[in-house]
């Protein structure tokens, strides 16, 4: 066990939280979510669980922070793909959006468990910060799309949500799941790998 020194300054706390998120993200990509605990996250950091409790109280608090980081990265790339002053046909828009979606599959894997798992195990205050950021990005992109194609805000919002939910569900279903593959084999059902970008386009 390495010596643990509690962070004091805000910069130190942010650096420590970055370590925690990196460890949790690594576990998310290597083991089933239900097997991840604060103890396994602490173990990957060579900390005790008590030390981890100085920063978070549930693993979902960590994963909400990770989801937030990945969401901001997604929105940054989404807006960069559609600079002001340029025009695209619906087909061109769909292709550029599909490229961004494909580059941010990790965000959609987290989104797949956001509402049903992550959000129910965090405080309202933490979730409020996340929701504020989400709606800021969503509303801005919806306006951009509505203005570009002369859509109502409602219709543009419905398109955004349909893409988000489809991407999240598709990422969850296309992610490698050994149990699912074994179940299909037992049931005699052929397993077909899906092309995520093509499915989103």
Stretches with model-predicted labels:
Residues 103-125, 178-183:
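Amphipathic alpha-helical segments used for helix-helix packing
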Residues 147-201:
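Hydrophobic/aromatic-rich alpha-helical bundle segments in the mid-to-C-terminal region
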Residues 65, 79-107, 159-163:
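Hydrophobic alpha-helical connector segments
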Residues 121-149:
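Amphipathic alpha-helical packing segments from all-alpha helical-bundle domains
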Residues 19, 27, 33-61, 65:
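Helix-turn-helix
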Residues 15, 19-26, 44, 61-81, ...:
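Alpha-helical structural segments
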Residues 94, 138-142, 201:
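An amphipathic alpha-helix signature
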Residues 1-15:
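N-terminal intrinsically disordered/low-complexity leader segments
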